[in-house]
Amino acid sequence: MKNQTPLRAMLLAVCAALCVMSVSLNVHAQTAQPDDQTNLETELYLIVGTNQDVDASRLPASLESVVRQLRATLPFKNYRLAATLINRIKNEGKLELSWIGGPLASSQSGAASAVAPSFSQFKVRQVKLVRNTENQQVVQMLGFNFGARIPIQTSGAIAASGAGVPAFNYESTGLSTDISMRESEPVIVGTLSVGPSGDAIILVVSAKRTQK
């Protein structure tokens, strides 16, 4: 009987330890933060400002405030929407896009050439919801990066048939920054000068939470 007493005590101690561990695991499971399933919708607009006599496309109504700001600060005769990119990103996620599009700059003749495309890339290292110094919730984009390779017409080469063929050189342009914005409020990120005609690419971005 004396030998059974220490064994019984040891078994009771093991059972007590297991009970404490089980309670601890249950409490941890109840207090652990659930995975954030919030998604954000980002919209990137590429607007081209030019003084050339080109057909200016109508800009979306959501960009009216941006257009007023552009006309007040940038002395371009015409503005056209070159691209609209809409993407869905998980909160605290990243985004990376590459695409081939139409010309972003006008040729010296005043018309955008359809012969040579533009190559563009858009990256954001992290998109997340944060609180600003006034405790307002805003969307923060860390590592915002836009880059493009723009075809610039240099001369008109002569083909074997005797017809003129335009010659192009590709020039790189881009912008990198960190920005914050209110939800659903388009903001101008920056402008990039392109081409000998003095055209400019205006980067506008907005972001908002989406329904699950």
Identify the meaning behind each predicted range:
Residues 1-9:
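N-terminal secretory signal peptides that target proteins for export/translocation
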Residues 2, 29-212:
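Outer membrane pore-forming secretion/assembly proteins and partners of Gram-negative envelopes
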Residues 12-26:
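Bacterial N-terminal signal peptides
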